[in-house]
Swiss-Prot record:
Protein name per the record: Conotoxin Cal6.11
Organism whose genome encodes this protein: Californiconus californicus (California cone)
Record lineage: Eukaryota, Metazoa, Spiralia, Lophotrochozoa, Mollusca
Similarity comment: Belongs to the conotoxin O1 superfamily.
Proregion positions: 23-43
GO molecular function, one term: toxin activity
Range of residues in the leader sequence: 1-22
Length: 70
């Protein structure tokens, strides 16, 4: 009975680890594709730091959402 419980817990832990690894891979692909909030608003060449409350302007500069692109 104890062995069965240990095996079930081990399988659950391994399954959780696989899901975490898969989620991290999908997140990296999503970030590289330019679909994050900041990069979606302009050029994809602003870099990974331009996201959240920022936007990427056509001249590849990262600005606040409240600033206009000049």
């Amino acid at each position: 009975m104890k062995l069965t419980c240990v095996l079930i817990i081990a399988v659950l832990i391994l399954t959780a680890c696989q899901f975490i690894a898969a989620d991290n891979t999908e997140y990296r692909k999503w970030r590289r594709s330019g679909t994050s909030t900041g990069m979606r608003l302009g050029s994809r060449d602003c870099g990974p730091w331009c996201w959240g409350q920022n936007k990427c302007c056509p001249d590849e500069s990262c600005r606040s959402l409240h600033e206009s692109c000049t």
